[in-house]
Regions:
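Metal-dependent catalytic cores of enzymes that make or break cyclic nucleotides
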Residues: 1-191
Length: 191
């Protein structure tokens, strides 16, 4: 019976993920796809504005080439930061420098190379989720607990809810959602 109880908790431990948005659940990069596309389009626009300035004689061909090269390096940095599992300080510093850069729109207004939200997403140090997205993702455990609290388990399966809802607890208390410590985490959950 104990084996069935453990197996049932394993089967149900992520049931709360059913209500987590797929764009959070399956997020494999810091930027959302539409943010990445917007950046690539913006950089292409900047590239074209640089070329137009050169054709108009406002900047030299050499200056145009330097600016295009700078833009290309910035784009490569952004793409690298977007998919890095861990974003080290030197990469974050490069992203900060890019964020400080601006370009001139056709109407004369000054615009940033990176929008604030794009910048914030690229500054995520570890993983791909923002604090808000991480909170949504971590809520699946609370949702699992809530869903399973609505089920009347038999006596033989009485620990299923507790075990399933504790699967992200860590021995040192840094897990979630209850921050249980080693002595509070059942052996079955540790498995």
């Amino acid at each position: 019976a104990h084996k069935h109880e453990l197996l049932m908790s394993v089967w149900l431990h992520d049931i709360g993920k059913l209500v987590i948005p797929l764009e959070v659940m399956n997020k494999d990069a810091r930027l959302l796809p539409e943010q990445k596309t917007a950046i690539l389009h913006r950089f292409e626009k900047i590239r074209l504005l640089i070329q137009i300035a050169s054709l108009k004689g406002e900047i030299s061909v050499e200056t145009m080439q330097e600016r295009e090269e700078e833009l290309q390096k910035a784009q490569e940095t952004i793409l690298r930061a977007n998919t890095a599992g861990f974003c080290p300080d030197d990469l974050r510093e490069e992203v900060c420098r890019i964020h400080e850069k601006t370009y001139m729109e056709e109407d004369g207004s000054e615009k940033p190379w990176l929008e604030e939200e794009e910048f914030q997403m690229l500054m995520i140090r570890r993983g791909t989720l923002s604090e808000e997205e991480r909170a949504v993702m971590e809520s699946h455990v609370v949702i699992t607990d809530k869903l399973l609290s609505e089920i009347r388990f038999s006596k033989e399966l009485s620990h299923v809810r507790e075990w399933a809802a504790s699967h992200h607890e860590l021995l040192n208390g840094s897990g979630y959602p209850k921050h249980l410590t080693a002595d509070q985490i059942p052996m079955e959950v540790r498995i």
